[in-house]
A protein has these predicted regions:
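A late C-terminal transmembrane helix in Major Facilitator Superfamily
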Residues: 333-370, 378
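Extracytoplasmic gate region of multi-pass secondary transporters
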Residues: 35-39, 217-272
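Hydrophobic core of transmembrane alpha-helices in multi-pass small-molecule transporters
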Residues: 26, 94, 105-121, 227, ...
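Intracellular juxtamembrane helix-capping segments at the cytosolic ends
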Residues: 42, 120-134, 321-334
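C-terminal ends and interior cores of transmembrane alpha-helices
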Residues: 89-102, 291-303
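Helix-loop-helix hairpin linking two adjacent transmembrane segments in secondary transporters
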Residues: 145-192
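Cytoplasmic helix-loop-helix junction between adjacent transmembrane helices
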Residues: 112-147
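C-terminal transmembrane helical hairpin of 12-TM major facilitator-type secondary transporters
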Residues: 262-265, 271, 276-329
Length: 404
């Protein structure tokens, strides 16, 4: 890895990229999160089970996972200049036609396309681009950028809730498509490739990395951990609003709790990114994972409003901190030339985990009749993630000592 500390000033355009990717991922992640508010209206209208409806999130996640690898490779080889426009076309089209569908197969197909050709395109490839605009404080830059996902997951479900109430779920999807078109096109024009990434792409020799483990081993460890931490976090993302409305809380209150979760998620992503610059990416990842694993367990057991807001804030801060820490790990442990593929592979396992968590959360609800098992399952998967991260930490220390 290059000596980042020797460079004092980063290109100012890097902050334009931060704002642009923040916005695009806010819309993309917002749609993924808004499945939770469409879940009950769709289940009620078509008679689909919670598990079957939540599977829409799963197929979107799997689309993001598998195609994310392709887009990561394309980003490393050709750059990301036109990724915003490509994602705009598919995200807008999928939202528009979701308002027209009346079959669960069409529902799955449209969410798969949204994940594969929208969410996957503006996710890890653009994060890799942003990370290598910055040599001085890449963690902070990535934390702010990643905060867009949390912002979108709080704002878009709230907008969707109000649109559904006023216009119904069909028109809600179509109005969202118009809104996305107006916002995404201008920001897509601002996407440019990192100069560092451009140089790395044409360089004959590999750049120096000051890290004890090979890039392949780093990616393997991160990928193994990510799948379990994302299973943990996806259960509340998909099922928190149905959990609260099943407990006789209003839809407005449920959406407000989710909004608080995501507001603190914005804070968590930024602080986690900066913390990664200060104490290291992996210690930050472990710390945030512990908080996520503990806090997710409480949702089925707290039935008073203040407690739910406090718990949502704690979970939002730590789960979002995990997301930033993953990105900073990839940025600091792999080279610029491989960054797109590294983040895409991590994202692959992350989205597989998100999809599995969303599905099994619904399946366990269908079996048990409430969400107790679902959230216990989420916490158990978080514990597996912490174990893997601790072994990764020990492996780094051992190899660093051996090569000292």
């Amino acid at each position: 890895m290059s000596n980042d500390s020797s460079v004092v000033r980063d290109p100012l355009y890097g902050w334009v990229m931060v704002i642009s990717v923040f916005t695009l991922t806010a819309l993309s992640f917002g749609t993924m999160g808004s499945i939770s508010v469409f879940l009950k209206p769709l289940s009620n209208e078509f008679g689909w089970t919670r598990g079957n409806t939540a599977f829409g999130y799963t197929v979107a996640s799997l689309g993001s996972a598998f195609f994310g690898i392709i887009w990561g490779y394309m980003a490393d080889k050709y750059g990301t200049r036109f990724f915003g426009f490509f994602a705009t076309f598919f995200m807008v089209s999928c939202l528009f036609f979701l308002g027209k569908q009346n079959s669960i197969l069409h529902f799955y197909a449209l969410y798969f396309c949204f994940g594969a050709f929208g969410n996957a395109v503006v996710g890890s490839p653009l994060y890799a681009n942003v990370g290598f605009w910055f040599k001085k404080n890449p963690g902070l830059a990535l934390g702010i950028t990643a905060a867009g996902g949390a912002a979108g997951q709080g704002i878009i479900p709230l907008i969707s809730t109000n649109l559904i109430r006023v216009y119904g779920w069909q028109d809600a999807y179509m109005y969202l498509s118009f809104l996305y078109l107006l916002i995404m096109v201008p920001f897509s024009f601002l996407i440019k490739e990192s100069p560092w990434r451009k140089k790395a792409r044409i360089a004959v020799n590999d750049e120096f990395r000051d890290f004890p483990l090979s890039e392949r081993e780093v990616i393997t460890w991160i990928s193994c951990a990510v799948i379990f931490c994302c299973i943990c976090m996806s259960v509340p993302i998909v099922h928190l609003i149905p959990l609260l409305t099943d407990a006789s809380f209003s839809e407005d209150f449920a959406a407000s709790v989710f909004l608080v979760l995501m507001i603190f998620g914005i804070i968590g992503r930024i602080i986690s990114g900066k913390l990664g610059d200060m104490i290291g990416a992996l210690p930050t990842y472990i710390l945030m994972s512990i908080g996520q694993t503990i806090s997710v367990l409480g949702f089925p057991y707290i039935d008073f409003k203040v407690g739910l807001f406090v718990l949502a804030a704690a979970f939002g801060f730590t789960y979002s901190g995990v997301m930033s820490a993953i990105l900073v790990c990839a940025r600091m442990m792999v080279s610029a030339k491989l960054a797109g593929r590294a983040m895409a592979l991590g994202s692959f396992f992350g989205w597989v985990g998100m999809g599995l968590g969303g599905y099994f959360g619904g399946l366990l609800f269908d079996i048990k009749g409430d969400y107790t098992w679902s959230f216990q399952f989420a916490s158990a998967m978080g514990s597996v993630n912490i174990f893997i991260l601790w072994q990764f930490h020990k492996r780094i220390k051992k190899q660093a000592h051996a090569t000292a």
